[in-house]
């Protein structure tokens, strides 16, 4: 199987083409294993589609399916344009709906669409939380110090609410810093696109930031977010790492 390794603001992905849908959960888990496989946060399968430029299957590191992945969508768009030679302005089908993307060399902007849902704030485990769905559910906690991030606490919240968990610090009205515990990886990752989107949207909704901001995830790779016409836009660099063949024994 020919595969391509991609990175986007700290998240890494294994991407391949396929001609039909099937359950690839076991394969995803094998490929994403950092000790015995290729190593990645997620596995993306690009499939043909009659109406859109392509359709994808997205698998988390543990083999579970996910409807959406922000950084994964940017990596998929970069792959579709540079490897599959699809037009740089494209749309593709995910489990969370249609994603529109624009590729400009190594920069990719995607529209994450309209926010699916937002719930009221609540108190739990000594912190204030809000739940926001940007294609997948995210718990968000605004803090003064990102050292508050606690993996054990995140595990408890993730298990109870079946959601990703984010800690966010507002540096100023144009800049946020975010740390994310991702379900499916079951640990903190270097970045999470939909998580950063949830943090930005809630900060904007609460009038704490402008409608266009920079966000720095744990990886340090700064990305841009904007909210316009009731849609969430996400832009940043994508890196093609390498391509190779994976042999099954």
UniProtKB/Swiss-Prot annotation:
| Root EC class | isomerase
Enumerate the subcellular locations listed in this protein's record, separating them with semicolons: Cytoplasm
Return the annotated site residues (Could be important to modulate the pK values of the two catalytic cysteine residues).
Answer: 138, 182
- Sample GO molecular function, one term: diaminopimelate epimerase activity
UniProt catalytic activity: (2S,6S)-2,6-diaminopimelate = meso-2,6-diaminopimelate
Q: Which family does it belong to?
A: Belongs to the diaminopimelate epimerase family.
Name by which UniProt lists this protein: Diaminopimelate epimerase
Give the originating organism: Campylobacter jejuni subsp. jejuni serotype O:2 (strain ATCC 700819 / NCTC 11168)
Gene name of the record: dapF
